[in-house]
């Protein structure tokens, strides 16, 4: 994409792999100074070093987004290092253990909600505190196809992703007149380490069936989500806020 983020600062959570890493690379290649945040410190450092070796300005931060103190420290480190925060992609997320609603556990509920919903809330809270000081900024939250439809044995994950859309719309209303735009992306079936985990867990056939139900008849690439995120964060989307953009090969239009 021919979008420039020169002299801008971008923060990406879940940046050690998958959608987060692809988006961090895209921001860097578009000229942004990029903060890569993830709980996996080793892989985050490696990703940041990969970009730095190509001449990009990067910062690696270890952050568990379910920990408010770590999220606050992440945003403070971003600002103390680069002076501001212009764009944020709140991408960190995990899957739930497959189970009917009656068989789910409180432990799994708390674990998934802590990262996928509370984590997004916490990131937005501290990002917005900085952005309202500046009077500008853009945030993109990672929801999912699961934020638009139901999913058997995935109730916790889908509930969290529905919640992300609710937070996105509410915060967008609060900040629309203050120079801050907030949107969400809803990825469909994208080949990422999370998809690899599903195959390893014996869900390979389910993935194949999902692929067959995609009108475009293929699995998406992480870079296609990164393109959507960068567009939403750019001036090209200056009149877009509170939206949940599906990037799913047409799955939800069936």
Descriptions of predicted regions:
Residues 2-4, 95-98, 149, 230, ...:
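Short C-terminal tail/terminal secondary-structure segment
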Residues 82, 121, 128, 136, ...:
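C-terminal substrate-recognition "lid" of short-chain dehydrogenase/reductases
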Residues 99-101, 105-111, 206, 210:
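Substrate-binding pocket helix/loop in short-chain dehydrogenase/reductase
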Residues 129, 173-177, 238:
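Alpha-helical segment proximal to the catalytic Tyr-Lys
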Residues 144:
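Residue(s) in the substrate-gating loop at a strand-loop-helix junction
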């Amino acid at each position: 994409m021919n979008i420039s983020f020169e002299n801008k600062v971008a923060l990406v959570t879940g940046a050690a792999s998958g959608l987060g890493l692809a988006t961090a690379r895209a921001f860097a290649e578009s000229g942004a100074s990029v903060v890569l945040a993830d709980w996996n410190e080793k892989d985050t450092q490696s990703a940041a070093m990969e970009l730095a070796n190509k001449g990009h300005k990067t910062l690696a931060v270890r952050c568990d987004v379910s920990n408010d103190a770590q999220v606050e420290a992440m945003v403070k480190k971003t600002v103390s290092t680069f002076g501001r925060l212009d764009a944020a992609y709140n991408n960190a997320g995990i899957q739930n253990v497959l189970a009917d609603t009656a068989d789910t556990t409180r432990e799994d509920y708390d674990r998934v909600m802590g990262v996928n919903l509370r984590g997004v809330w916490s990131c937005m809270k501290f990002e917005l505190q900085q952005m309202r000081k500046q009077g500008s900024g853009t945030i993109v939250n990672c929801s999912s196809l699961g934020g638009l439809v139901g999913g058997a044995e995935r109730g916790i994950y889908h509930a969290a992703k529905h919640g992300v859309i609710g937070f996105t719309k509410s915060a967008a209303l609060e900040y629309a007149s203050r120079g801050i735009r907030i949107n969400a992306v809803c990825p469909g079936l994208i080949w990422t380490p999370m998809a690899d985990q599903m195959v390893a867990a014996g869900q390979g056939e389910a993935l194949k069936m999902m692929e067959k139900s995609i009108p475009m008849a293929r699995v998406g690439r992480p870079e296609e989500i990164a393109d959507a995120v960068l567009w939403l964060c750019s001036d090209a989307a200056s009149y877009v806020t509170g939206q949940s953009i599906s990037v799913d090969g047409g799955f939800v239009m069936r």
